[in-house]
């Protein structure tokens, strides 16, 4: 005779006794085993619920951190473009630079340079024309309100 405990998952059937089969487990023992199974299932549910709560808290936190890093990188690219064009404007006669020149010098993509120029208040986008008057390329130029006002903002540089 096979006991009811052996038909339940997680139980191993004992080998047959040569004299007879093992005695059937008492009802009290079976109810205790069932109670342990229910408790372990409840603990797993509580554990999974706890993990779900932690994930619900961490998800927006990670999203805010990722977005703030994205904004910081955009700002750094804009500042790098502005400072390069400012220095070139002070030490060169034209101060106009094409995208190819800026890509090679700053190590940024064209899309990043265009995005930074659109967000900047001091960079103007102009069109360079050939002798026939047709547009050839877009050039960027640093155009502040007053160059003398911009000089003190450059850290580490003495005024001359």
Swiss-Prot record:
The chain crosses the membrane at residues 47-67. It is found in: Membrane. One of its GO terms (cellular component) is membrane. It is a single-pass membrane protein. It comes from the Bacteria. Keywords: Membrane, Plasmid, Transmembrane, Transmembrane helix. Its main location: membrane. This is Uncharacterized protein y4lN. It comes from Sinorhizobium fredii (strain NBRC 101917 / NGR234).
């Amino acid at each position: 005779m096979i006991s009811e405990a052996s038909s339940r998952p997680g139980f191993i059937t004992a080998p047959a006794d040569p004299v007879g089969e093992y005695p059937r487990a008492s009802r009290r023992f079976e109810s205790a085993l069932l109670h342990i199974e229910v408790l372990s299932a409840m603990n797993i549910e509580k554990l999974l619920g706890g993990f779900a709560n932690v994930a619900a808290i961490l998800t927006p936190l990670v999203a805010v951190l990722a977005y703030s890093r994205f904004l910081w990188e955009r700002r750094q690219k804009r500042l790098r473009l502005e400072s390069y064009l400012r220095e070139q404007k002070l030490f060169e006669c034209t101060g106009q630079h094409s995208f190819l020149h800026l890509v090679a010098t700053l190590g940024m993509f064209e899309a990043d340079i265009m995005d930074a120029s659109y967000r900047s208040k001091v960079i103007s986008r102009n069109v360079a024309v050939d002798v026939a008057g047709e547009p050839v390329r877009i050039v960027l130029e640093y155009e502040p309100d007053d160059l003398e006002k911009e000089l003190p903002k450059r850290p580490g540089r003495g005024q001359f």
